[in-house]
Amino acid sequence: MDNFLALTLSGTTPRVTQGKGAGFRWRWLGHGLLELTPDAPVDRALILSAGIHGNETAPVEMLDRLLSALFSGSLTLTWRVLVVLGNPQALTAGIRYGHSDMNRMFGGRWQSFAESDETRRARELELSLETFFSSGQARVRWHLDLHTAIRGSHHLRFGVLPQRDRPWETDFLAWLGAAGLEALVFHQAPGGTFTHFSSEHFGALSCTLELGKALPFGQNDLTQFNVTSQALSALLSGVETSTSFSPPLRYRVVSQITRHSDKFALYMDAQTLNFTAFAKGTLLAEEGDKRVTVTHDVEYVLFPNPSVACGLRAGLMLERLP
């Protein structure tokens, strides 16, 4: 199985759907779904996902390289792994999504969207995770969902962590720092993301990794993400990652800007970078007689997008943690 990405993009089912790799067994579970199980017993399970948005190709290329290293035997596997290419049809078309944003649909929220390829795929991925986690006895469960951002950022690489009732484990946060993430953003409320689903339903330590900016296949400079690729390789093979890194800055979400109607106006232009700072009192958005302003001394914007569909998030506002 050295052509997982090509088969997924072409919509082709391989003639052989299971086999042996270098120290592990593999199973093709469907388009964009590949399970890897080490020959030796392990108590760690990992979801490695990318391509939830079809125009975010750099992480897909990174995963393809990791798979090549595993199948060539140059990289040892010490986790049970489910590799997920989230939205194959959008990846093939080179578009973010066909009908609706899948990363708003998880946790059963797909039922409130008009039926589409994305709603069907979200349901399929939920079932795939349920099967994967229920078929093993993993003591450790991680989910790393790799993305790229629509716009530029003051932090080239950053992580977004779902709301969680328990404290985050130190070794997980340390690995995120070793993977080159410059900032970590902590959600304070539930959401429809893939990582919130895996965290809430299966107790996984989950993070959305935002790596650079969305570009078409073949146009990505993957050298920007060498530190992340090296950390992923070390993780898969059970090697300790470097401890000589600057701890990521930490932010928490303090509010969400939502577009409710065509009267919505977001006062940020296309050049506004993620993590741009705004002073207290700054007018951020208006909709009819409703005004959204900065309420803390300083707030930072994340994922500003004035053109989202009505009812969806047009941006998050953050505050920096000590």
Curated annotation (Swiss-Prot):
It holds the Pfam family AstE_AspA_cat. Coiled coil: none annotated. GO terms for biological process: arginine catabolic process to glutamate; arginine catabolic process to succinate. Transforms N(2)-succinylglutamate into succinate and glutamate. InterPro entries: AspA/AstE_fam, AstE_AspA_cat, Aste_AspA_hybrid_dom, SuccinylGlu_desuccinylase. This is Succinylglutamate desuccinylase. The active site is at residue 210. It catalyses: N-succinyl-L-glutamate + H2O = L-glutamate + succinate. One of its GO terms (molecular function) is succinylglutamate desuccinylase activity. Binds 1 zinc ion per subunit. It comes from Salmonella heidelberg (strain SL476). Pathway: Amino-acid degradation; L-arginine degradation via AST pathway; L-glutamate and succinate from L-arginine: step 5/5. It is an enzyme of class 3 (hydrolase). Its EC number is 3.5.1.96. Keywords: Arginine metabolism, Hydrolase, Metal-binding, Zinc. The keyword Hydrolase applies. Zn(2+) binds at residues 53, 56, 147. Its cofactor is Zn(2+). The keyword DNA-binding does not apply. NCBIfam families: arg_catab_astE, PRK05324.1. Belongs to the AspA/AstE family. Succinylglutamate desuccinylase subfamily.
